[in-house]
UniProtKB/Swiss-Prot annotation:
Tissue expression per record: Mainly localizes in guard cells. Expressed at low level in leaves, stems, roots and flowers.
Species lineage: Eukaryota, Viridiplantae, Streptophyta, Embryophyta, Tracheophyta
Gene that this polypeptide is encoded by: HT1
Record organism: Arabidopsis thaliana (Mouse-ear cress)
Residue span, Protein kinase domain: 86-359
Protein name: Serine/threonine/tyrosine-protein kinase HT1
Modifications made to the protein after synthesis: Autophosphorylated.
Cell compartments where the protein resides: Cell membrane
Residue intervals passing through the bilayer: none
Role played: Serine/threonine/tyrosine kinase involved in the control of stomatal movement in response to CO(2). Functions as a major negative regulator of CO(2)-induced stomatal closing. Does not seem to be involved in stomatal closure in response to abscisic acid (ABA) or light. Involved in the control of red light-induced stomatal opening. Is epistatic to SRK2E/OST1 function during stomatal responses to red light and altered CO(2). Phosphorylates SRK2E/OST1 and GHR1 to prevents SRK2E/OST1- and GHR1-induced activation of SLAC1, thus preventing stomatal closure.
Length: 390
């Protein structure tokens, strides 16, 4: 904790005089000749300036009409986030409508994701609100070592926030960007891949499809363990099994999603195949292409990132299975975990990854041969064949 540097302010709960629930925008000049679009653009600019001010963020969260939630493992899940215990620190990531800050909540290092809900764009507002509700609803019921832990949430339009555990080493994409191409050891590749696949195996066991699995949404902690994060576009499989539309990111998106066809949990397996390729190369998938060009290459030409010659054949085979064009040919994460665990055992025993597969095939071939020999031999005392299991 001592190493964290925080801004000298704290969100206090009702310690000041009552603040306005939502600071009003300055009056815009009335110009009969200006179009409605221009007026909305000016209003949006004013709102953005207000939102960009850290002071206004704290004012909104300090207001009395704040809906709060806090995760609990009891029979009844209650969310009672105590904002007097929340300290906001420095921003370390941002997006089009969100910012992520370091913070402390109840003496624990946390990440505070703040989402700005625009008031002048109805479609965007509805989409962001739904993503926020979905992420809170899903995260609050997920408990696994390889899933980022939800701690609390608060909602005060136009600012919504989600508080999760702080992952000090950033995301997997940042980690790979610092590495030389093809430089990760097979031990590291398998360790990271196992973390991801175990988290995804659990997620699918809970009936959840992530829909945006990528290196940017995989976070690393102090021990360099990976946790799956960012559930804004996730959904329960019963609610999105036959859903259409592309909710993920093109470079990692399965072809059926790009084509807006019905899809299943196997879209996550495809994305994992791309991530596994990233681990073996440390490169950005479809580097040199724009996201749209990458989507076209996958959907129309069935292209995939090139597998390097240095990639272990067994690992290359798994990657190809994961990103198969036919979803039914992609393995489940339970199978992926089992395969990676066997590969990990081979590496620890100093054996090549192909050894396990080769030994399995050899053993099966020997058993089949013996079975054929035994069943073809007739007993001298009986015309019946010798039982296989005799």
């Amino acid at each position: 904790m001592s190493g964290l540097c925080f801004n000298p302010f704290r969100l206090r709960w009702s310690l000041r005089s009552k603040l306005p629930l939502e600071p009003s925008l300055p009056n815009l000049p009335c110009n009969p000749s200006s179009s409605k679009t221009n007026r909305y653009a000016e209003a949006e600019t004013m709102e953005k300036k207000r939102f960009d001010s850290m002071e206004s963020w704290s004012m909104i969260l300090e207001s009395e009409n704040v809906e709060t939630w806090e995760a609990s493992k009891g029979e009844r899940e209650e969310w009672t986030a105590d904002l007097s215990q929340l300290f906001i620190g420095n921003k370390f990531a941002s997006g089009a409508h969100s910012r992520i800050y370091r913070g402390i909540y109840k003496q624990r290092a946390v990440a505070v994701k703040m989402v700005r809900i625009p008031t002048h764009k109805e479609e965007t507002r509805a989409k962001l609100e739904q993503q926020f509700k979905s992420e809170v609803a899903l995260l609050s019921r997920l408990f696994h070592p390889n899933i980022v832990q939800f701690i609390a949430a608060c909602k005060k339009p136009p600012v919504y926030c989600i508080i999760t555990e702080y992952m000090s080493q950033g995301n997997l994409r940042m980690y790979l960007n610092k590495k030389e191409p093809y430089s990760l050891s097979i031990e590291t590749v398998l360790r990271l891949a196992l973390d991801i696949s175990r988290g995804m195996e659990y997620l699918h066991s809970q009936g959840v499809i992530h829909r945006d699995l990528k290196s940017n949404n995989l976070l690393l902690n102090d021990e360099m363990r990976v946790k799956v994060a960012d559930f804004g576009t996730s959904c329960l499989e019963t609610q999105c099994r036959e859903a259409k539309g592309n909710m993920g990111t093109y470079r990692w998106m399965a072809p059926e999603m790009i084509k807006e066809k019905p899809y299943t949990r196997k879209v996550d397996v495809y994305s994992f195949g791309i991530v596994l390729w990233e681990l073996t190369t440390a490169l950005l998938p479809f580097q040199g292409m724009t996201p749209v060009q990458a989507a076209f290459a996958v959907a129309e030409k069935n292209e995939r990132p090139p597998l390097p010659a240095s990639c272990q054949p067994a690992l290359a085979h798994l990657i190809k299975r994961c990103w198969s064009e036919n979803p039914s040919k992609r393995p489940d994460f339970s199978n992926i975990v089992a395969v990676l665990e066997k590969y990990d055992e081979c590496v620890k025993e100093g054996l090549p990854l192909t050894s396990h597969a080769s030994l399995t095939k050899t053993k099966k071939a020997i058993l089949d041969h013996l079975k054929g020999c035994v069943t073809s031999i007739s007993s001298p005392f009986s015309s019946s064949s010798v039982p296989v299991n005799a």
